[in-house]
Amino acid sequence: MFLLKRTFQPHNRSRKRTHGFLSRMSTRGGRRVLKARRLKGRKRLTV
């Protein structure tokens, strides 16, 4: 048998780097995500 480990090890830096506002703005797809969230009326656009 194998043991299942907890895969989510939270770190604020990696969280911001992958899902933050600047990383969203840096790519075309990310800007699309922000646009979609604005249109939907999300209170928080990014993390």
UniProtKB/Swiss-Prot annotation:
Belongs to the bacterial ribosomal protein bL34 family. GO terms for cellular component: ribonucleoprotein complex; ribosome. This is Large ribosomal subunit protein bL34. Gene3D superfamilies: 1.10.287.3980. Residues 29-47 have a biased composition (Basic residues). The gene is rpmH. Residues 9-47 are annotated as: Disordered. PANTHER family: LARGE RIBOSOMAL SUBUNIT PROTEIN BL34M, MITOCHONDRIAL RIBOSOMAL PROTEIN 34 FAMILY MEMBER. The keyword Ribosomal protein applies. The keyword Metal-binding does not apply. Pfam families: Ribosomal_L34 (PF00468). Signal peptide: none annotated. Keywords: Ribonucleoprotein, Ribosomal protein. GO terms for molecular function: structural constituent of ribosome. GO terms for biological process: translation.
